[in-house]
Amino acid sequence: MAKIIYPLQKDTIVEDDHRALAQWINTNPLPRLTMGPLVKKFEDKWSNWLGVKYSVACNSGSSANLLMYYALLRSGRLKNKKIIVPSAAWVTTVAPAIQLGFEPIMCEADPKTFGLDISHLEKLLKKYRPSTVIMVQVLGVPNDMAQIMKLKNKYKFFLLEDTCAAMGSQYKGRKLGTYGDMTSVSTYFGHQFSTIEGGLVSTNDRQFYDLLLMLRSHGWLSGLDPKTRAGLLKKYKIEDMGTHFIFCEPGFNFRLTDLQAFIGLRQLEKMDWLVENRSRNHNLYKNLLSPNFGMQEYDAKSTICSIHFCALAKDKEERKKIIAALDENGIETRPFTSGNQGLHPYWFREYGKFNAPMANRLYDCGFFLPNYPTLSESDIKFICSVITKTALKNRS
């Protein structure tokens, strides 16, 4: 491969952030670096930006997904452990269902959004009557949320919303991450904004929030407000000895650090700029590539803040040629990250292969293109010219 000129992603933590972090670390008295007051400040600022009541920061988007599943399981509110999972997803959207003993049922990908196929989803809802559906807002492009919320009201399921790659996107003016009973985001390198590693779970449900706080930190009472803490001590008939070393849940240690929260707070200051530039880039890719390639579709009233742009080649062979041409020109790419989750060993070893037309097409034909805030219009035009010339040459 040629030297990478156009990486798939660039860090949103820039020189000014490094300098500010160095200055903060060396303040007198020296600041606490493990989880402390800055994490809470970061959680509150994110909740305010997103428009939700509560957020719990953790060490990764994958942990955020696991916490959502586990809080739901520990809540005692499930009528069964059946859950519909998406075929077009990252592995840690689906894996907690297996890890925690749910009964996952896979759903076909939608030809327009690459999210949940609405027709197949309703068939599965009718047949299995699951307690839960988890969805992914794939690469920042919203699912058909109007239809999904209608189905939620009709079939009374809990909705977990994975927006790990969709921070800043909107469906007809409403931010993604505000539809689910719980929603997850990832603040890993290359995502809309970064805390080095990290994630958050957001919710408007107080019971879920209290469970998330406990499950993130060993299952203990530390972090709960005094009234909730007192209620749990009374419920379990435990004397309050002024210690938080009382464990009400079998939890994890998924905590974020104040060091990461310091960076996150700075990142949120430029969130609107990050969203605006990624959205501009996504729309330009769409306009330039739509005549010749398959891609996600979305309503004109929606805002798309993607971490990559995904295009679909005609077939496997064309994708190979396009990837080779991109490599030769220093443009980093990859196949649609994992495509159809139902074709990976962790899934088919347990449940058999999930073969569905659209999910398989993503697996065979999808490829990613760079998107980051400093990518210019001329950069995108060059990238698109490489792809288009390669494809049209081989189609003639």
Residue map of PLM features:
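N-terminal "arm"/small-domain region of PLP-dependent enzymes with the aminotransferase-like
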Residues: 1-32, 157, 246-248, 370
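PLP-dependent aminotransferase class I/II
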Residues: 10-11, 40-44, 52-55, 61-62, ...
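A generic structural signal for well-ordered alpha-helical segments
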Residues: 25, 47, 97, 151-152, ...
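Phosphate-binding glycine-rich loop
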Residues: 32, 40-82, 96-98, 106-108
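Structural detector of well-ordered beta-strand residues that form the stable sheet scaffold
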Residues: 56, 84, 105, 159-160, ...
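PLP-dependent aminotransferase-like
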Residues: 73-154, 158-163, 170
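Residue-level detector of structured alpha->beta connecting loops
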Residues: 129, 156, 180-181, 293
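Conserved active-site segment immediately N-terminal to the catalytic lysine
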Residues: 161-195, 210, 244-246
